[in-house]
Design a protein with these regions (language model features):
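C-terminal motif of bacterial Sec signal peptides marking the signal peptidase cleavage site
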Residues: 15-19
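Mid-length scaffold segments of soluble, non-membrane domains
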Residues: 68-107
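Sequence contexts marking disulfide-bonded cysteines in secreted/extracellular proteins
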Residues: 21, 25-27, 134-136
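Helix-rich interaction surfaces within compact, conserved domain-sized segments
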Residues: 103, 108-160
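Bacterial N-terminal signal peptides that target proteins for export
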Residues: 1-8
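A generic structural signal for short, non-catalytic loop/turn and secondary-structure boundary residues
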Residues: 35, 43, 83, 107, ...
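Surface-exposed, low-hydrophobicity interaction/linker segments
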Residues: 24-79
């Protein structure tokens, strides 16, 4: 009987170790500090600085771009304006997404921008107001979850 419990405990330990080390395509969404310059509405980016790249808050245009699919990289002023309006941006490195561009574009709508960004260190990044998720591979489930969790939530995080 004692051998049985030892075997069960070893099996549980092995399963726990396997589950804890399993690789996921996206990291856990992380909140970034609200930039002190987030209340600045600018008409040009001269002298503007953002705390991260791609940004999750900071100076921005007074009017946000429309949601949808873009074939160019949005400026940081455009990105932050869209995030402040409650939108989510999914950016991808055009040389690192393999055959997933069609799937990525399915995420786009009035509240979600999908845009290339060749300066990314990793294949896909999702941003929302003060939130970011990084993905080493395209992961529909993780990105849809991020969009669901953060689209429309900018105001709740704006004054923290």
């Amino acid at each position: 009987m004692r051998k049985f419990f030892v075997c069960v405990n070893l099996l549980l330990l092995l399963l726990t170790q396997t589950a804890c080390t399993a690789e996921s395509d996206c990291d856990i969404p992380r909140q970034e500090p609200l930039s002190a310059s987030s209340s600045f509405h600018l008409l040009e980016s001269v002298g503007a600085v953002w705390d991260s790249s791609p940004p999750t808050s900071g100076p921005h245009y007074p009017i946000a771009p429309a949601g949808g699919i873009y074939d160019f990289t949005l400026s940081s002023l455009e990105q932050v304006a869209f995030l402040e309006s409650g939108g989510v941006i999914v950016q991808y490195h055009p040389n690192r997404i393999e055959n997933n561009l069609g799937k990525l574009t399915l995420l786009a709508n009035n509240n979600v921008i999908v845009s290339p960004n060749p300066t990314l260190d990793i294949p896909v990044i999702g941003t929302a107001w003060t939130w970011k998720i990084s993905c080493k591979n395209f992961d529909t489930t993780a990105l849809r979850g991020f969009i669901t969790d953060y689209v429309g939530k900018a105001e709740a995080n704006h004054r923290k």
